[in-house]
């Protein structure tokens, strides 16, 4: 309280029960303080549980109270305390410090009364019961000489004091009565009445002061709160919380190009129902899962009082952009792609460089997918090689190989020269802008002509250094290991000229070389690190695939903890198989990776939707042109690696046919599953497995549903078989074969038969049931079938040139003399794509 604060007289509860005014407890001294205001004076009564003493102190008067009044109040209070002590002495109380507590209501009134009651201990109650013999006893208390002044002062204040003797255990009332006279002081007397003790009938509630009190009397007994009381108190607190509405927080909401209604509500910390209500006010019916555009979301957020920050959805990929510091750059190993025509010795060259037998493991002697290898030379320098397939079906994979390489080695067989895939590899390297090294292989074979190969290279603008060009042409033999050292020197020389550098610090980034699914290991992805250092436990995003790197192995199959730039590794831990050729990046957490993947999936979906109407227009055009009977060949393609599946799809979609539509229901990496069987059964599709097989359950389901499953290990065998299936679905070619001519010389009417033409076979042969064409004046007037063929009166199957015969047509009798009949047969021929 401040000195200027107005204080009103208030009642005070002293003791273990309820406290009506300021209450405090000092844990250090074990003392309880009760404060009350009398008149304009602050009175503090302190009971110490340690020393069992009672002290009274008076604070200064509020509002500049006169010091005289303060002294008078202090004197009055001391006199009242003296009466209490003397009453205790008369009750044979030898130790006043045992007064434990003051209970009930003690009202200090500024004009009249002072009432104080004390509680009794259990010992006092027992003593009281022994001494009570009458209901009321009047006791006269002798007042010593020094008490007259006290009684005179009490008379002036008209105070009546009630005191209870704690030792006897009886409630004693000291009634100080006097008759007021204006000019004299009357003699006062104190009447002490003994009143029958009333034991406390109600336990007191447990509170902090009761538990800390040293009162052992019966009146100090307490009771615990009932469950109902606790429940009522809790409900009351809940009602208070409900009534106190929380203050609304307005936020800055980041809104992308599209956002879900539920996501918008979460971003604003609003109820979904409130957001839907705002949308309804805008005339939009939506649910929590529906997606709305940024403009609508901005209106809703603004109406609800939030600030809006618009961002492009593509901004989620900004975290992938980082620049390397110049001082962090370090020299890295060159990445070399080996390309060329099939069977020209690319894998054998790598076999020689690695001193390992890779070619022996290739089915059909050709590379089926990209392989990445790291070769360490004798001087400690390293070269990373990427082996690409040479078959024509793997054009996309060769193109992808040139995009991640620093140097392209194009292998040309000395005995075979430039072929189709050789030219394609040259074009890929030129488009990628990478240096080219021509390796003329198989120079150990007899009857080779290296100059012829060089001349063929000139045609494609590949000019060697000896002819003044900038392309290094090195004759080698992978089988005999001839000039391999010169090839390595050429690679390192070009790499040194390019000054290849990358930063090994920071988050890793690179490109996906290949991906597959392996039973027991999950998704396996071969990647090439181009920047930073990839470590176990990193979160990466590759296209729409993401996950944590659980394990890394190098090209030798050894597990490693990290991979630096130009190091190819195989990782496992992605949630799905990524597309080969996509970039990968390390991000901070899985949520960031998921957001980027979802954004990319939405882009792919929008692109697919935009392409769909074109196909529909093409179908409508075909129907309008009358060619609506287009046959479909549904296929399900499963492969071991993504690059192989990509090559198969690319080759199949290139098969030309206007009558057969190849429909790829599903393509993926991994073994053939029961879901593939179910899809094939529902659509009557053929399942094609490339280097994969169906499981036991899938085989059982396929046999039951009679699904055609075909396995392949060489890609061109697969393509040839699909082409044959499509050819068998084509309508055959109907060819007309001329077999003879007949001249009608006379027409006869025969009963029950109709008109019969007497004819002469002028050329070839005429057969019964053959197709005929009737000409009159060299104009075709009828086409049909020959119904009757007779020689005299006998039915015959055929009549040759130079003989007469009788003929009749099916459902046609308009024949005349000198008409000419051409006889022919329709022959069907199987078409090929």
From Swiss-Prot:
Belongs to the TRAFAC class translation factor GTPase superfamily. Classic translation factor GTPase family. IF-2 subfamily. CDD domains: IF2_eIF5B (cd01887), IF2_mtIF2_II (cd03702), mtIF2_IVc (cd03692). GO terms for cellular component: cytoplasm. Its main location: cytoplasm. GTP binds at residues 340-347, 387-391, 441-444. Residues 365-369 are annotated as: G2. Pfam families: EF-G_D2, GTP_EFTU, GTP_EFTU_D2, IF-2, IF2_N. This is Translation initiation factor IF-2. It comes from the Bacteria. Residues 331-501 form the tr-type G domain. One of the essential components for the initiation of protein synthesis. Protects formylmethionyl-tRNA from spontaneous hydrolysis and promotes its binding to the 30S ribosomal subunits. Also involved in the hydrolysis of GTP during the formation of the 70S ribosomal complex. The lineage of its organism: Bacteria, Pseudomonadati, Pseudomonadota, Alphaproteobacteria, Rickettsiales. The keyword Ion transport does not apply. Keywords: Cytoplasm, GTP-binding, Initiation factor, Nucleotide-binding, Protein biosynthesis. One of its GO terms (molecular function) is GTPase activity. Residues 340-347 are annotated as: G1. InterPro entries: EF-G-like_DII, EFTu-like_2, IF2_II, IF2_N, P-loop_NTPase, Small_GTP-bd, T_Tr_GTP-bd_dom, TF_IF2_bacterial-like. Residues 477-479 are annotated as: G5. Residues 441-444 are annotated as: G4. It comes from Rickettsia canadensis (strain McKiel). Residues 387-390 are annotated as: G3. It is found in: Cytoplasm.
